[in-house]
Amino acid sequence: MPQQLSPINIETKKAISNARLKPLDIHYNESKPTTIQNTGKLVRINFKGGYISGGFLPNEYVLSSLHIYWGKEDDYGSNHLIDVYKYSGEINLVHWNKKKYSSYEEAKKHDDGLIIISIFLQVSDHKNVYFQKIVNQLDSIRSANTSAPFDSVFYLDNLLPSTLDYFTYLGTTIKHSADAVWIIFPTPINIHSDQLSKFRTLLSSSNHDGKPYYITENYRNPYKLNDDTQVYYSGEIIRAATTSPARENYFMRWLSDLRETCFSYYQKYIEGNKTFAIIAIVFVFILTAILFLMSRRYSREKQN
């Protein structure tokens, strides 16, 4: 069977419970960021120290690096989806099997060599003081293909979500250069819009007429699941916590996109086919009303 490419959309109703998926032992208290890089495509932080064990892992996996992904807007930017819901961004923590292999390069040649932990970012009304430690370093790597010492005290434990139940599946690295076991925490961490927008000011390695682009987005779209790909989860809490709001938010975004399409048709045909333009603007008003009612209902549910 073909290799399962990453990222994917995780359908919570199809995920399989597995009694072997015990809580992970996360030992980031000794991890220290050494350098931060603008690779021209993403932000990468290299680490010394720190490892994960326990759960279903056969031994310790050493932390190597952290990668950050985002989108043009705050309402999308994660690589992985939960029930077709995209979060504002995603952090990937890359680990390798140091006990079994002599180096990261050797480990990535094997399907048990790499473990990648995924943490979702969700824009909220409050700044994340721990995530700000990363944001404060971005001015030193604004140009593409630059790196700088990470010159701030930073504790990676503080970026872990409040709930550590997880999904897992065998996929690939985002570049598809190696197999990797993914561990995905569906509970996001909250950050502020201003913090995420700072990443969009970084310069890309791509250019047009000699002028560099900004890295306004760098997330990847999900790949279709292979017939033999299995996604497992570690607890019932995941299913209850992710299904309803994720689908509702996605549906609201879809309605909003449809409204914008109808409005663009109205602007396009108002001087020509007035009948078509009137139909389009009627749909705009209808969709606006539906979105307003859904937004009020969703706000009441969050308050309750």
Curated annotation (Swiss-Prot):
Pfam (any one): Carb_anhydrase
Taxonomic superkingdom: Viruses
Residue spans, topological domain Intravirion: 295-304
Main location: virion
Induction entry: Expressed in the late phase of the viral replicative cycle.
Chain ranges passing through the membrane: 276-294
Keywords: Disulfide bond, Host-virus interaction, Late protein, Membrane, Transmembrane, Transmembrane helix, Viral attachment to host cell, Viral envelope protein, Virion, Virus entry into host cell
Virion surface side, ranges: 1-275
GO CC, any one term: viral envelope
Post-translational modification (record): Apparently non-glycosylated.
One GO term of the biological process aspect: adhesion of symbiont to host cell surface via host membrane carbohydrate
Compartments (UniProt record): Virion membrane
CDD domains: alpha_CA
Alpha-carbonic anhydrase domain boundaries: 1-235
Gene Ontology terms, MF aspect: carbonate dehydratase activity; zinc ion binding
InterPro entries: CA_dom, CA_dom_sf, Carbonic_anhydrase_a-class
Assigned protein family: Belongs to the alpha-carbonic anhydrase family.
Physiological role: Binds to chondroitin sulfate on the cell surface to provide virion attachment to target cell.
Subunit annotation: Homodimer; disulfide-linked.
Protein's name in the database: Cell surface-binding protein OPG105
Provenance organism: Vaccinia virus (strain Copenhagen)
Species classification: Viruses, Varidnaviria, Bamfordvirae, Nucleocytoviricota, Pokkesviricetes
Gene assigned in the entry: OPG105
